[in-house]
From Swiss-Prot:
InterPro entries: Znf_C2H2_sf, Znf_C2H2_type. GO terms for cellular component: nucleus. It is found in: Nucleus. SMART domains: ZnF_C2H2. Belongs to the krueppel C2H2-type zinc-finger protein family. This is Gastrula zinc finger protein XlCGF66.1. Keywords: DNA-binding, Metal-binding, Nucleus, Repeat, Transcription, Transcription regulation, Zinc, Zinc-finger. Residues 1-31, 240-271 are annotated as: Disordered.
Length: 606
């Protein structure tokens, strides 16, 4: 028994060696055929002969110059295409089927199956060829005809009805070349040209590397077919075509699947990642994670001014405002910037066209998004709501400012004068100027000083701006923007277009309406007065109210020593009494005024 087993093992090993040797010879023969096919294709393209060297040589191929044989381009193109099909078959084991308009690649097993059942669809092939429908998802519902449907060169319309197809090309043998059955000669030669390397898509300047007929612009290849041979649960094979390289939105054809996916991104507007805190949606998970940091309590603190930021990148950008000197000033409004690029971006606001005007107030905007945000202030529409107290806001910036001022847990910076607390050091510094009277911002035109940069900008625009084109016919006051004029004219007409949805009270401006809703109709007012029991939304409002009971006047004027209960009263006093530059004087009595509107109001007394 042992001898028989040993002999059996020896025989098996011999068969295995013989099989390996046959495979090696077959592989060697395949490589030789590929080399021959490639050299023949080079000859057809260039008309020059190349002789392959043996392995002992330096490598490469010998160039045998010869006479260039002029042949018809169409014949050369056909033969080159067949050579390419043979090379593809040798490399991938796939057979190319070509119709008038489409190139489809099948594996050898699939091709054998189609050849074996050719009689099932031979009658359909004899019909007059019709044009292919654009590629779409095939939903053929009659399972009894699915096999025949699949074999009819995968052609169907959206309703599930079979489409008569043109004859398909038989696979050329690996060792020879036969004439192609489906050629472009059956179509007008001026409309169709086959080029195995490049094809110019209509509407573009550069050729696209696609192998196929240019008469019909939709291409199908191995990568275009999503699942064209997918058996279902019943074992019946259904065919489904998806043209992934043609965009359904703009009907654009792309050469690579990666280019198609990149091109499709702007068309995809689905935002499947939503924030559990505020409900805002995002298109990717990274954007959602960045957004969720704004809800977390952890903030990155600026050591200079105490301002907090959700991300380190925003903190780094903010730090540059402390480090850089602002050398670049705008010639229009005199605002200074630390970078030339920031100045250039700002100057666009003065020069760009603003074709979109608000129907309510006449203010113009450059983009539709800016107009939409502005119109919310006119209509009272509020999309952004606070998850803590439910308060709604017209813009996301207003919501963020509200959350930082009201709901932030830590307010480490407190005022020693009035006890008011702030979340940022910069706000504390700005607040303390109301007590000390420090005004670090001075106007270069008239020398007037201001406590904040926003007040200085407002002063320049109202007093020193030359290009004031909007004039009030009632009081003679000039305005830089039409929206400012419209808002000002309401003081003369008494118009109040903004009404409260709760009590119906009307207001002239949207800011007055918002202040009314916060003070009167908001449900949560945590700060109450111990004297009269009145409730307030903010601690600052409570402190200001308590001064009416105590008579405290912490804000005093450095010029005359007069005291005031609020900083607003102090500012109004300084402007009316101690302002040195009063440009507008009365011709009747010689009295001077700071603003033209005050002079016009004074003229009425004469």
């Amino acid at each position: 028994m042992g001898m028989w087993e040993e002999a059996s093992d020896t025989g098996m090993k011999g068969k295995k060696k013989k099989k390996d040797k046959n495979e090696e010879e077959e592989e060697r023969g395949k490589k030789e055929r590929m080399v021959n096919l490639t050299l023949e294709m080079i000859y057809l393209l260039t008309g020059e002969h190349y002789i392959p060297r043996k392995k002992s040589d330096d490598g490469g191929a010998l160039h045998a110059p010869g006479s260039v044989i002029q042949k018809e381009n169409n014949k050369n193109d056909k033969k080159i295409l067949e050579l390419m099909s043979n090379i593809i078959q040798l490399l991938t084991g796939e057979v190319a089927i070509r119709t008038h308009h489409v190139s489809i690649y099948f594996s050898l097993d699939e091709w054998d199956y189609i050849k074996g059942n050719k009689d099932l669809y031979e009658d359909g092939m004899k019909e007059e060829p019709q044009q292919l429908h654009p590629l779409a998802v095939c939903e053929y519902k009659d399972e009894s005809n699915v096999t025949a449907h699949m074999e009819s060169t995968l052609g169907c319309n959206n309703d599930g009805n079979l489409t008569k197809m043109s004859p398909v090309e038989q696979p050329p043998p690996a060792n020879g070349i036969k004439e192609e059955v489906a050629s472009c000669e059956e179509i007008n030669q001026s409309d169709c040209s086959i080029n195995p390397f490049t094809e110019q898509i209509q509407g573009t300047d550069t050729p696209t590397p696609i192998m196929g007929c240019s008469h019909f612009k939709t291409k199908v290849n191995k990568y275009d077919i999503n699942s064209y041979w997918s058996p279902d649960e019943s074992g019946i094979t259904k065919s489904t075509l998806h043209s992934k390289d043609s965009c359904n939105e703009g009907h654009k054809h792309l050469s690579h699947k990666s280019d198609y996916n990149k091109h499709q991104n702007p068309h995809k507007r689905q935002k499947s990642f939503s924030c559990s805190k505020c409900g805002k949606c995002f298109s990717n998970l990274t954007s959602l994670h960045c957004h969720q940091k704004t809800h977390k309590g952890k903030k990155l603190l600026c050591l200079k001014c105490g301002k907090c930021f959700a991300t380190s990148s925003k903190l780094i950008i903010h730090r540059q405002t402390h480090m850089d000197k602002k050398h670049f000033s705008c010639s229009e409004c005199r605002i200074c910037f630390s970078k030339q690029s920031s100045l250039a971006r700002h100057q666009i606001t003065h020069t760009e066209e603003k074709p979109l005007a608000s129907s309510e107030c006449g203010k113009c905007f450059a983009s539709l998004s800016e107009l939409t945000v502005h119109q919310r202030t006119n209509t009272g529409e509020k999309h952004d709501f606070c998850s803590e107290c439910g308060k709604c806001f017209a813009t996301s910036s207003q919501l963020i400012a509200h959350q930082q001022q009201v709901h932030i847990e830590v307010k480490p910076f407190s005022c020693t004068k009035c006890g008011k607390c702030f979340s940022y050091r910069s706000r504390l510094v700005r607040h303390q100027r109301t007590h000390t009277g420090v005004k670090p911002y001075s106007c270069s035109e008239c020398g007037k000083c201001f406590a904040s940069s926003s007040h200085l900008i407002g002063h320049r625009q109202q007093v020193h701006m030359e290009g004031k084109t909007f004039f009030c016919s009632e009081c003679g006051k000039y305005f830089l923007y039409q929206s400012q004029l419209v808002r000002h004219q309401r003081t003369h007409t008494g118009e109040k277009p903004y009404s409260c949805s709760e009590c119906g009270k009307c207001f002239a401006t949207s800011s007055q309406l918002m202040a009314h809703q916060q003070q009167v109709h908001i449900e949560v007012k945590p700060f109450s007065c111990s004297e009269c029991g009145k409730y307030f939304l903010y601690r600052a409002h409570l402190v200001r109210h308590q001064r009416t009971h105590t008579g405290e006047k912490p804000d005093f004027c450095f010029e005359c020593g007069k005291c005031f209960a609020t900083s607003l009263q102090l500012i109004a006093h300084q402007q009316q009494v101690h302002m040195e530059v009063k440009q507008f004087s009365c011709s009747e009595c010689g009295k001077s005024f700071l603003y033209r509107s005050h002079l016009a109001r004074h003229h009425r007394t004469h």
